[in-house]
């Protein structure tokens, strides 16, 4: 599977001068209804309404509703309909912003009232009325900023966007951007009178009837422009699709995603928690979660050792000047925790005898790794030098964006920094990408595409020439992999471009996993050198790489990917013996002892629960192997297997049972064992 293609799947057509794009679409015989209806056109990379009229003959790409771009436009238009419904039912509400987002949309409102589920039901009803009316989306351009300000005098949040054009470069601000200030009127299809309007740069679908299926999903509190220092707002989320069938499939996916939510499973399976006493975004792993985490780390550690990485360890805090040298304090200070001022010495009268220093919790490991590299002279014979650490870092995330294990404030990165020569650079990047993809596949994630994040023109260090060389090198390595490469303009860190490995989970959702960043700037800032073969001193090229992203995030993704039913080799408890009666417990204890002797995490349930209750309990805990024993099993020297899918195999000789479990775990299979897969009683 590849990344979603946002572009049109329809062949280009020509729009004659003075003719609307919609007319050209109809004359070309392209559909105007259904899930493949043309909703907008693309002109030189920009999306335009079907009412757009070119001044000269122009070739355009028709964009269908069932493409990513088509859905995005439908969702943006649905956000407008939502805002119209809110202002009809809650006239006091002031408009914020309402962008399309992945699989949906939202709109922020300045209102003291917190929307209830009953409110969402009423809003959906009102939206359906507006959609049924078929109101036309009509674009008009303001002749001046003053004209826009006059019309929006009662909309303070819109006025802010108009007055300073803030958000012109923000993809979530659809109100302003480009060379014009424009608004969209919702027009009554019979009278042509305006029913409602909103500041917006567009584009939009032709009429509200082009929103075939939608649902409001939830509401929450928010801050204007996501800044806690700004006004508090109420946000309503929704989703919209090109057909009822597509919406139904998405809602089913949402229900399954809720069942797989790692925050919910973390509690049910006793894996981790977020105690209030510790703080937001700071998880603690319980014994069972600790086992899963250790298995993740141990396997990764072994693979890194085999690949020639050298393990290092660095402290959690450092002096301020280290991050001044690296540039983090200039470019990343918003993501860092406040400094700790320590080591000051005072005289008895309170005057300073020795000034203190600022220390920071480290947000990244790389500066400390550079100091390890620089601790002694380096030769070209040592390169590539691959330094690796499971390093704890701390990043200040706003409380509103902290989310379970996937967005935390304290995390452990499987962080590597590779120092190589320019001549080795391409080969090292190629082998590194292969290593990353292979290791992720070993954990059961094997559906990938790549993103190439390039320079943010407002936030970078180094010369344009260096950035261009680094970007071209990464692009070539990515293309050589054969995976789809999706551009991410302006998405790079301040010190270099990066490749991001995007992995799809069992529900088809994309997660950013590994990042590979090429950096020519940091070696210069830290004066990193090596002695070349000709005796001259040269600077190495630096490759930053985090394979999991963070252990916490990877743990959360795998929990949802497997719905808590981890592969047997990762499962906290791999086998549980369930005696039919108390008298059978000693027999199962012997079998469990055999399993433990071969490294299997096994136990016997000797609780007072009835056998059926024990089976239900351990099935709900996603234990991959349940071993049942009664009188016949004891007499025959056998056990009965019970699997996660509730199938059962009876009368398996105990030695064969032990061997089958040990073999399955050691083979690191990433699917749940079943009677069919285990092939009990069958020879190889």
Curated annotation (Swiss-Prot):
Gene Ontology MF terms: ATP binding; metal ion binding; threonine-tRNA ligase activity; tRNA binding
Source species, domain of life: Bacteria
Enzyme superclass (EC): ligase
A biological process from GO: threonyl-tRNA aminoacylation
Known cofactor(s): Zn(2+)
One Gene Ontology cellular component: cytoplasm
Region of interest (Catalytic), ranges: 261-567
Domain TGS, residue spans: 1-64
Note accompanying the cofactor annotation: Binds 1 zinc ion per subunit.
Keywords: Aminoacyl-tRNA synthetase, ATP-binding, Cytoplasm, Ligase, Metal-binding, Nucleotide-binding, Protein biosynthesis, RNA-binding, tRNA-binding, Zinc
Enzyme Commission code(s) on record: 6.1.1.3
Residues that coordinate or bind Zn(2+): 366, 417, 544
Compartments reported by the entry: Cytoplasm
Record's catalysed reaction(s): tRNA(Thr) + L-threonine + ATP = L-threonyl-tRNA(Thr) + AMP + diphosphate + H(+)
Entry-linked Pfam families: HGTP_anticodon, tRNA-synt_2b, tRNA_SAD
PROSITE patterns documented for this protein: AA_TRNA_LIGASE_II, TGS
PANTHER family, alphabetized: THREONINE--TRNA LIGASE, CHLOROPLASTIC_MITOCHONDRIAL 2, THREONINE-TRNA LIGASE
Quaternary data: Homodimer.
Purpose of the protein: Catalyzes the attachment of threonine to tRNA(Thr) in a two-step reaction: L-threonine is first activated by ATP to form Thr-AMP and then transferred to the acceptor end of tRNA(Thr). Also edits incorrectly charged L-seryl-tRNA(Thr).
Family: Belongs to the class-II aminoacyl-tRNA synthetase family.
Annotated protein name in UniProt: Threonine--tRNA ligase
Organism: Mycobacteroides abscessus (strain ATCC 19977 / DSM 44196 / CCUG 20993 / CIP 104536 / JCM 13569 / NCTC 13031 / TMC 1543 / L948) (Mycobacterium abscessus)
């Amino acid at each position: 599977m590849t990344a979603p293609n946002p572009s049109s799947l329809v062949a280009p057509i020509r729009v004659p001068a003075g003719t609307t794009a919609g007319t050209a679409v109809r004359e070309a015989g392209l559909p105007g209804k259904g899930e493949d209806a043309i909703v907008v056109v693309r002109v030189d990379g920009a999306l335009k309404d079907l009412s757009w009229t070119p001044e000269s003959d122009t070739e355009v790409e028709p964009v269908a509703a069932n493409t990513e771009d088509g859905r995005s436009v439908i969702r943006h238009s649905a956000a407008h309909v939502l805002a119209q419904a809110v202002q009809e039912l809650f006239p006091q509400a002031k408009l914020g912003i309402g962008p399309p987002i992945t699989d949906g949309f939202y709109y922020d409102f300045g209102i003291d009232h917190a929307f209830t589920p009953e409110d969402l039901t009423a809003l959906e009803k009102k939206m359906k009325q507006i959609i049924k009316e078929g109101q036309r989306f009509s674009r008009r351009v303001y002749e001046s900023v003053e004209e826009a300000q006059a019309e929006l005098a009662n909309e303070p949040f819109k006025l802010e966007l108009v007055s300073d054009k803030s958000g012109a470069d923000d993809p979530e601000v659809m109100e302003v951007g480009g060379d014009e200030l424009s608004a969209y009127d919702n027009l009554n299809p019979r009278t042509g009178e305006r029913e409602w309007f909103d500041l917006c740069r567009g584009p939009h679908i032709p009429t509200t009837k082009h929103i075939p299926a939608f649902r409001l999903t939830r509401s929450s509190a928010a801050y204007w422009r996501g800044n806690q220092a700004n006004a508090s707002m109420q946000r309503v989320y929704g989703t919209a699709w090109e057909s009822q069938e597509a919406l139904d499939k998405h809602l089913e996916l949402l229900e399954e995603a809720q069942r797989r939510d790692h925050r919910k499973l973390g509690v049910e399976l006793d894996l981790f928690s977020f105690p209030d006493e510790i703080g937001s975004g700071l998880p603690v792993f319980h014994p069972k979660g600790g086992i899963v985490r250790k298995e993740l780390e141990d396997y990764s550690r072994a693979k890194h050792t085999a690949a020639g990485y050298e393990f290092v360890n660095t402290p959690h805090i450092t002096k301020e000047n280290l991050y001044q040298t690296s540039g983090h304090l200039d470019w990343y200070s918003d993501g860092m925790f406040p400094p700790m001022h320590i080591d000051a010495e005072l005289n008895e009268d309170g005057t300073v005898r020795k000034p203190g220093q600022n220390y920071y919790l480290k947000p990244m490991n790389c500066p400390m790794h550079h100091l390890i590299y620089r601790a002694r002279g380096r030769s070209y014979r040592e390169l590539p030098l691959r330094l690796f650490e499971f390093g704890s870092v701390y990043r200040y995330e706003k409380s509103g964006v902290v989310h379970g294990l996937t967005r935390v404030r304290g995390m452990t990165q499987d962080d590597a920094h590779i120092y190589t020569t320019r001549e080795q650079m391409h080969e090292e990047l190629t082998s590194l990408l292969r290593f990353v993809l292979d290791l992720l596949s070993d954990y059961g994630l094997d559906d990938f595409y790549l993103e190439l994040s390039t320079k943010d023109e407002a936030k970078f260090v180094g010369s344009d020439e260096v950035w261009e060389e680094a970007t071209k090198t990464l692009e070539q390595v990515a293309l050589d992999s054969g995976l789809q490469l999706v551009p991410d303009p302006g998405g790079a860190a301040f010190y270099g471009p990066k490749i991001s490995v995007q992995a799809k989970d069992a529900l088809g959702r994309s997660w950013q996993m590994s990042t590979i960043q090429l950096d020519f700037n940091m070696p210069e800032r830290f004066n990193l050198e090596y002695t070349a073969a000709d005796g001259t001193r040269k600077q190495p090229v630096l490759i930053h790489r985090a394979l999991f992203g963070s252990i916490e995030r990877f743990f959360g993704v795998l929990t949802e990917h497997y719905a808590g039913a981890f592969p047997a080799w990762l499962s906290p408890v791999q086998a549980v013996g369930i005696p039919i009666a108390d008298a059978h417990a000693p027999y199962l204890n012997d079998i469990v002892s055999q399993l433990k002797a071969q490294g299997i995490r096994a136990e016997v349930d000797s609780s007072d629960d009835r056998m059926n209750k024990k089976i239900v309990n351990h099935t709900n805990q996603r234990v991959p192997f349940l071993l049942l024993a009664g009188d016949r099993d004891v007499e025959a020297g056998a056990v009965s297997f019970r699997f996660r899918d509730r199938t059962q195999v009876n009368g398996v000789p105990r030695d064969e049972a032990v061997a089958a479990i040990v073999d399955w775990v050691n083979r690191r299979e990433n699917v749940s064992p079943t009677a069919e897969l285990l092939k009990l009683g069958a020879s190889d």
